């Protein structure tokens, strides 16, 4: 750890030496005054405003006019560099917001894109804290052409853009900027049934070429969180979501041909190509009670054939790799069930048929409950056996707010499958200590009963020894976890430290807990200078550390890293970092290091780039038998770019390279230094053409190849199988074609085709037929064609 401390000291000293004048000028600048924001009232109108009213300067009814936008980044409270005016009004059914944004001719970044694919665009947004609880808010964003993105912002969790609702936008680029019109139905919001509403509101604008983010009212990084800084806005009288019911039936027709390899292998059912025609129908229904509680019921939840997981390295990974949820039923209102520790990860529910969920807010109480089944655990069980059934899962979450942006909550989950069960209970909370300090905590306990003859879902399970004439078929265990975190957030200094403890018997089957039997401390600190410069947004050092032990006191890992980061305009970031680490794996100690350089930039409206190169050392976690894990030389390269040559077209390219080479003094004898143990290549080419706001075409080409030395690498384990299990492809090329007609969330038509070429071949000259590798990646082992339709009925 000593070299990293010296490295950090060197960087800090060097920074202050070369920029001492800047440090002196910037570090002690007092914050701008933040006067108490008076309550503003939104006028009620009898005629809805239209976009043309602002384009043609027509006379309009009374509106709440907002002009004083202030910088959040790069400045803190200084006037926005480009003028913005917002106009707010409402009628019986809708809230209206119109943004008139001035900008230099030809400088506006706007593309005709799919909904929520707006990372390359300027835009405006509205935050709505409808319960004025300073904890969460709706987020409505539009680019200058009226393309939408929406989400839920929650203090401590950030912005969750999986939330989708029905609202309306129009946008137009003008010679001196752009104008965007919002119409948000009250039916799309949840709020109290008081006769007069007072909400927290923030208006937002982003100017990407300047890396500038503006707010009204003045919101500062000197204060922890956003919601407590929103402006109170009233005058909303006699509004209500009304009777709010919605039904989304969907239908799916699909033809699927694939190479089926039973797991575990069974001589009576050898590998074979299978063709399946599927027709599925389902229904999602939603009911709102007392304007605040939402009840969702689902039958055959909509699976996410239209979404595709982003490429991630899965080779030579000690712990499970996290892939986010994509299914609509689970991603909606997912934040209600989120806690500091990931006790609920809905991807653990693989194949549900029925489900019901309640989420909402009553006074200062936030509640969530979910009950759902899962057919997947019983799929391969003998017909009529005890385990030829389905699992039943339940989750309950309740939280009570107190003070200012603080809460205490309870979480409980249950999973039952035949005579096996898993129970989790937890207490967690968040306490705002000052305008900069916040603390989070969580304690959980689990009870687990497992059949020792079934695959175990716990990371560690102490099965009883099979002795005697009647050995037990099941066993039970309990476990605990603790989490505590303290975070300081400011404009220059940011610091967080936490402690995590999982006992050996801790098991949350519905959660994502990649490791147990650890006591771990993590800390991260950064200090950023923010000079008054036209190009430099901020710069400064970043440092982090991690150390953990098991529950008998054996040191398992430590890691420390320091970095220099520079942020410029045009969304440009440079970072140079150095890391040192120790890891105990398979009772073998390893000392590691890494050096990394990262850059991201979007210099033009039509181009953005990102890249990271890392070199160092790392373990071969799963070598070929009978070798023990050993240290090798690591090289990693992540490259990506986005091209937008014209408004309707977008091309994204991603390349990930991961190489582990032999290292002199560490690799088993007989292998040349730095010769390859494996090379992993992942490439994704993604093209999107937007014919209209509703109709689009998406093409994805994925290539994944793991080229390795079978004498040094256990291919079965590294490619996701096991010794004697199904044969995994070492090389695959997947083509994904999707036509989408999305009128609005809930109403859509999808037509898709997927074809996977691999290096696997079914050799039917053998008895029984076997799957073998071939040299070329030209054998289609999976094909899927589907048509999916859904329609939103709203009452």
State where each predicted segment sits:
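N-terminal secretory signal peptides that target proteins for export/translocation
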Residues: 1-6
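Bacterial N-terminal signal peptides
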Residues: 8-21
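Structural preference for beta-rich elements and adjacent junctions enriched in aromatics
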Residues: 24-401, 409, 419
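Outer-envelope beta-barrel architecture signal
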Residues: 93-95, 136, 178, 195-199, ...
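Outer-membrane beta-barrel transmembrane domain signature of Gram-negative proteins
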Residues: 218-241, 377-425, 431-432, 573-637, ...
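Surface-exposed extracellular loop regions of Gram-negative outer-membrane beta-barrel proteins
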Residues: 240-295, 393-468, 540-542, 600, ...
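Alpha-helix capping and helix-loop boundary segments enriched in small/acidic/polar residues
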Residues: 269-273, 317, 346-349, 382-389, ...
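Exposed, low-structure sequence patches enriched in small/polar residues
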Residues: 351, 445-795
């Amino acid at each position: 750890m000593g070299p990293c401390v010296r490295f950090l000291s060197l960087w800090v000293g060097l920074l202050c030496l070369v920029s001492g004048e800047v440090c002196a000028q910037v570090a002690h600048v007092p914050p701008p005054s933040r006067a108490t924001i008076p309550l503003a009232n939104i006028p009620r109108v009898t005629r809805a405003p239209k976009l043309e009213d602002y384009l043609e300067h027509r006379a309009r009814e009374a509106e709440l006019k907002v002009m004083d936008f202030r910088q959040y980044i790069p400045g803190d409270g200084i006037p926005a560099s480009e003028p913005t005016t917002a106009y707010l009004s409402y009628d019986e059914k809708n809230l209206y917001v119109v943004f008139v944004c001035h900008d230099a001719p030809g400088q506006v970044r706007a593309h005709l894109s799919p909904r929520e694919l707006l990372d390359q665009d300027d835009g405006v947004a509205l935050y709505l804290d409808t319960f004025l609880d300073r904890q969460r808010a709706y987020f409505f964003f539009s680019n200058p052409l009226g393309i939408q993105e929406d989400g839920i912002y929650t203090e401590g969790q950030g912005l969750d853009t999986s939330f989708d609702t029905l609202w309306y936008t129009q946008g137009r680029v003008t010679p001196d900027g752009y104008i965007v019109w919002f119409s948000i139905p009250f039916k799309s919001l949840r709020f109290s049934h008081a006769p007069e509403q007072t909400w927290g509101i923030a208006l937002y604008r982003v100017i990407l070429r300047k890396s500038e983010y503006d707010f009204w009212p003045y919101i500062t990084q000197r204060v922890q969180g956003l919601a407590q800084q929103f402006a109170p806005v009233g005058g909303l009288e006699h509004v209500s979501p009304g009777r709010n019911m919605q039904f989304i039936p969907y239908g799916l027709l699909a033809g699927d041909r694939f190479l089926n390899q039973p797991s575990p292998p069974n001589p009576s059912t050898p590998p074979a190509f299978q063709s399946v025609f599927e027709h599925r129908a389902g229904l999602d229904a939603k009911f709102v009670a007392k304007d605040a509680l939402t009840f969702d019921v689902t039958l055959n939840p909509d699976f996410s054939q239209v979404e595709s997981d982003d490429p991630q390295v899965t080779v030579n990974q000690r712990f499970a790799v996290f892939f986010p949820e994509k299914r609509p039923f689970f991603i909606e209102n997912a934040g209600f069930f989120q806690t500091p520790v990931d006790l609920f990860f809905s991807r653990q529910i693989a194949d549900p048929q029925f489900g019901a969920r309640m989420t909402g807010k009553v006074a200062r109480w936030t509640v969530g409950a979910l009950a759902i089944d899962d057919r997947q655990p019983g799929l391969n069980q003998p017909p009529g056996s005890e385990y030829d059934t389905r699992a039943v899962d339940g989750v309950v979450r309740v939280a009570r707010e107190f003070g200012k942006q603080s809460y205490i909550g309870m979480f409980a989950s249950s999973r039952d499958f035949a005579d096996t069960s898993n129970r989790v209970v937890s207490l967690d909370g968040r306490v705002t200590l000052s305008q900069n300090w916040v603390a989070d905590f969580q304690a959980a306990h689990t009870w687990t009963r497992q059949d020792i003859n079934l695959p175990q879902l716990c990371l560690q399970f102490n099965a009883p020894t099979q002795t005697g004439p009647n050995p037990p078929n099941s066993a039970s265990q309990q476990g605990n976890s603790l989490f505590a975190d303290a975070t300081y957030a400011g404009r220059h200094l940011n610091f967080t430290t936490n402690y995590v403890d999982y006992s050996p018997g801790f098991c949350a089957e519905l959660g994502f807990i990649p490791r147990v039997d650890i006591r771990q401390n993590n800390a991260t600190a950064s200090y950023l200078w923010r000079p008054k410069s036209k190009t430099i947004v901020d710069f400064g050092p970043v440092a982090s550390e991690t150390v953990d032990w098991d529950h008998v006191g054996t040191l398992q890992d430590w890691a420390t890293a320091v970095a220099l980061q520079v942020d410029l305009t045009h969304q440009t970031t440079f970072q140079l970092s150095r890391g040192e680490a120790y890891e105990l794996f398979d009772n073998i100690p390893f000392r590691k290091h890494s050096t990394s350089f990262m850059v991201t930039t979007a210099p033009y409206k039509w181009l953005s780039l990102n890249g990271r190169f890392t070199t160092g050392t790392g373990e071969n976690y799963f070598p070929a038998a009978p070798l023990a894990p050993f240290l090798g030389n690591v090289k990693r390269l992540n490259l990506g770019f986005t091209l937008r040559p014209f408004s309707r077209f977008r091309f994204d390219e991603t390349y990930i390279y991961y190489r582990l080479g032999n290292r002199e003094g560490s690799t088993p004898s007989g292998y040349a230094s730095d010769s390859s143990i494996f090379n992993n290549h992942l490439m994704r080419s993604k093209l999107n053409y937007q014919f209209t706001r509703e109709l689009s075409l998406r093409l994805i080409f994925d290539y994944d190849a793991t080229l390795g030395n079978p004498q040094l690498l256990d291919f079965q384990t590294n490619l996701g199988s096991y010794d004697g299990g199904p044969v995994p492809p070492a090389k695959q090329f997947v083509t994904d074609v999707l036509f989408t007609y999305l009128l609005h969330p809930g109403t859509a038509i999808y037509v898709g085709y997927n074809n996977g070429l691999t290096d696997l071949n079914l050799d039917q000259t053998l008895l029984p037929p076997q799957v073998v590798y071939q040299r070329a990646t030209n054998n289609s082992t999976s094909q899927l064609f589907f048509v999916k339709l859904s329609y939103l009925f709203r009452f």
